[in-house]
Amino acid sequence: MSKLTHVREDGSAHMVDVTGKNETSRTAVAEGFVKMRGDVVKQLFSAGLPKGDALPVARIAGIMGAKKTPDIIPLCHPLPLGKITVDFFELADGVRIEASVKTRGVTGVEMEALTAVSTAALTVYDMIKAVDKMAVIDGIRVLSKTGGKSGDWSVQ
């Protein structure tokens, strides 16, 4: 098993030293789902929810979440994010949220992509909970990443 890079010999946590790493172009794509009743899906995608048009709000929340990742996830490095996209795909039983993040830096952007998806999903949940109390956030994961010493990776 490989050693955790953010844990010192005595077991205490520290922020990994990335000052000696080369800058490379890095990307990450993550996804997540909000499951809900079919009638609520229709309201969500037609801007018909009591709280208003949820998808533009959730998109901005996801982008803001990615930018705030080092403020809410301990030990994450602040990164100059060059591009963040958050997209929504209608499903019969909910919405699939996909976030893509890009930077040129010394560490990856997987956490930023995951935070974008999570924040967007939480925002969708907040805006539908009045009409579907049984909604579920599920399946948040990294789909792919590029760049860095460990190279490219994808679930496919």
UniProtKB/Swiss-Prot annotation:
<dbReference type="Pfam" id="PF01967">
    <property type="entry name" value="MoaC"/>
</dbReference>
<comment type="similarity">
    <text>Belongs to the MoaC family.</text>
</comment>
<protein>
    <recommendedName>
        <fullName>Cyclic pyranopterin monophosphate synthase</fullName>
        <ecNumber>4.6.1.17</ecNumber>
    </recommendedName>
</protein>
<feature type="active site">
    <location>
        <position position="126"/>
    </location>
</feature>
<dbReference type="InterPro" id="IPR047594">
    <property type="entry name" value="MoaC_bact/euk"/>
</dbReference>
<dbReference type="GO" id="GO:0061799">
    <property type="term" value="F:cyclic pyranopterin monophosphate synthase activity"/>
</dbReference>
<keyword id="KW-0501">Molybdenum cofactor biosynthesis</keyword>
<comment type="function">
    <text>Catalyzes the conversion of (8S)-3',8-cyclo-7,8-dihydroguanosine 5'-triphosphate to cyclic pyranopterin monophosphate (cPMP).</text>
</comment>
<comment type="pathway">
    <text>Cofactor biosynthesis; molybdopterin biosynthesis.</text>
</comment>
<dbReference type="InterPro" id="IPR036522">
    <property type="entry name" value="MoaC_sf"/>
</dbReference>
<dbReference type="InterPro" id="IPR002820">
    <property type="entry name" value="Mopterin_CF_biosynth-C_dom"/>
</dbReference>
<feature type="binding site">
    <location>
        <begin position="111"/>
        <end position="112"/>
    </location>
    <ligand>
        <name>substrate</name>
    </ligand>
</feature>
<feature type="binding site">
    <location>
        <begin position="75"/>
        <end position="77"/>
    </location>
    <ligand>
        <name>substrate</name>
    </ligand>
</feature>
<dbReference type="InterPro" id="IPR023045">
    <property type="entry name" value="MoaC"/>
</dbReference>
<dbReference type="GO" id="GO:0006777">
    <property type="term" value="P:Mo-molybdopterin cofactor biosynthetic process"/>
</dbReference>
<dbReference type="InterPro" id="IPR050105">
    <property type="entry name" value="MoCo_biosynth_MoaA/MoaC"/>
</dbReference>
<keyword id="KW-0456">Lyase</keyword>
<comment type="subunit">
    <text>Homohexamer; trimer of dimers.</text>
</comment>
